Amino acid sequence: MTHSPLAQFDIKKLIDIKMFGFDVSFTNSSIYMLLASILALTYFYLAFYNRKLVPSRLQVSAEIVYNLVADMLNQNIGVKGRKFIPLVFSLFIFILFCNLLGMTPYSFTTTSHIIVTFTLAILVFLTVTIVGFVKHGLRFLTLFLPHGTPLWLAPLMIVIELFTYLARPVSLSLRLAANMMAGHVLLKVIAGFTVSLMIYLKFLPIPLMMILIGFEIFVAILQAYIFTILSCMYLNDAINLH
């Protein structure tokens, strides 16, 4: 029997839990998010628990990741962005480890589900909105009226800018989920063809499969970066009212 390429995204209950009328069951998605968090914490613990003047390769790799996120905030927000390093760094690492964990055979890609990515996007959206109002008060609403807009065009621009602002969590979450799902479906389909082709071409299709896996790993890293850089840009709008 041929399995559907979409079967890999099925949510399966492991522990059925009902709380206050809500289904909060522990699923395969839950366990892989927990596993990604544990792996991330273990990685950074091993990298930094015994820091040395001459760093190990593990410490160097962890410092590169940290500096990457710090540079993103610095380039987009400036010095004011340093206080958001814990939030943005946690987002980047969580998404990165979830994406990469999903590349292992017979695993589950949590970031291919819109409910997971939308939750992360809503976290960014609420943070940006709260920071904007706390820092600027009602002046934050000027974000919806670009500077220099003619008075007669102001109502239309406000509606457009407000719609664009409210659409941010949707576009942010859909981009990540769609890319991760599309990549894994493509790999599943091509892997099926590769097995069939090996009957006639022996091991020749394997290099092609390895290239595609390498490309998908690149996409997994890139999508974590894109989600994070867009989060930094949204924070910049709230802090500097651009």
UniProtKB/Swiss-Prot annotation:
Key component of the proton channel; it plays a direct role in the translocation of protons across the membrane. It comes from Rickettsia massiliae (strain Mtu5). Belongs to the ATPase A chain family. InterPro entries: ATP_synth_F0_asu, ATP_synth_F0_asu_AS, ATP_synth_F0_asu_bact/mt, F0_ATP_A_sf. GO terms for cellular component: plasma membrane; proton-transporting ATP synthase complex. The lineage of its organism: Bacteria, Pseudomonadati, Pseudomonadota, Alphaproteobacteria, Rickettsiales. Its main location: membrane. It is found in: Cell inner membrane. GO terms for molecular function: proton-transporting ATP synthase activity, rotational mechanism. F-type ATPases have 2 components, CF(1) - the catalytic core - and CF(0) - the membrane proton channel. CF(1) has five subunits: alpha(3), beta(3), gamma(1), delta(1), epsilon(1). CF(0) has three main subunits: a(1), b(2) and c(9-12). The alpha and beta chains form an alternating ring which encloses part of the gamma chain. CF(1) is attached to CF(0) by a central stalk formed by the gamma and epsilon chains, while a peripheral stalk is formed by the delta and b chains. This is ATP synthase subunit a. NCBIfam families: ATP_synt_6_or_A, PRK05815.2-4. Pfam families: ATP-synt_A. Keywords: ATP synthesis, Cell inner membrane, Cell membrane, CF(0), Hydrogen ion transport, Ion transport, Membrane, Transmembrane, Transmembrane helix, Transport. The chain crosses the membrane at residues 29-49, 84-104, 114-134, 140-160, 189-209, 210-230. It is a multi-pass membrane protein.
